[in-house]
């Protein structure tokens, strides 16, 4: 479904070049729950950004459903991000003065579907993440765990093939983190879910060894 072939990414600042990704090769399957482990600065978020089309790679290839992205134009990346990828971050990125239903709808602004369909998809997504009784509330009326559920609903609303999660439990307490992880794990039964974390203890609770890749040691064998 998704494959990275010898992906390299460099950043140059003030004449100094840093290797963020140095020849990463790994393949992911649909209905897989994958953890990318490593400390801050090891390249985890860079890898997630490359997979999500938020950042360009310098060499190698990203293969999506058997298709190379080497010659992708910006319009191709836009279509990929809008239709195939759902992003979940540590920060909820919710607009405080709008209701959570409107927040979820905003994620579908560029999808080209009608207002009525956006509203229905948003409602369905919020119900799916367990917020049926909170649909008409604003973010300020919710707990941290509930706000992260809104963010997950926003990522789900367009029914993407891939969910990319960057430290999704980083701002939550231990009990709430486990609840959110259980929800994300459930979603992996029908989607490819790739999660970045620097917390090996949390990862080892939810991931089998073969689906946890240690980016620090560049061990990309499956």
Question: What spans do the regions from the language model cover?
Answer:
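ABC family nucleotide-binding domain
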Residues: 2-203
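Single conserved hydrophobic/aromatic residue that forms the stacking wall/gate
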Residues: 204-222
């Amino acid at each position: 479904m998704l494959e990275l072939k010898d992906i390299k990414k460099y950043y140059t600042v003030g004449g100094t070049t840093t290797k963020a990704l140095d020849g990463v090769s790994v393949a992911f399957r649909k209905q897989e729950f994958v953890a990318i482990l490593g400390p801050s600065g090891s390249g985890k978020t860079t890898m997630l950004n490359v997979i999500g089309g938020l950042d360009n790679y310098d060499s190698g290839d990203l293969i999506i459903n058997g298709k190379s992205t080497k010659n992708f134009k910006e319009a191709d990346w836009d279509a990929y991000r809008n239709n195939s990828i759902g992003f979940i971050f540590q920060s909820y990125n919710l607009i405080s003065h709008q209701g959570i239903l409107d927040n979820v709808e905003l994620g579908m602004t560029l999808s080209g579907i009608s207002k009525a369909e956006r509203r229905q998809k948003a409602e369905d997504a919020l119900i799916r993440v367990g917020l049926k009784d909170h649909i008409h509330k604003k973010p300020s009326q919710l707990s941290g765990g509930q706000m992260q559920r809104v963010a997950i609903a926003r990522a789900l609303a367009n029914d993407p093939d891939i969910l990319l999660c960057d430290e999704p439990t980083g701002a939550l307490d231990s009990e709430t983190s486990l609840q959110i992880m259980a929800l994300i794990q459930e979603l992996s039964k029908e989607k490819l879910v790739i999660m970045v974390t620097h917390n090996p203890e949390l990862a080892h609770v939810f991931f089998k060894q073969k689906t946890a890749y240690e980016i620090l040691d560049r061990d990309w064998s499956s």
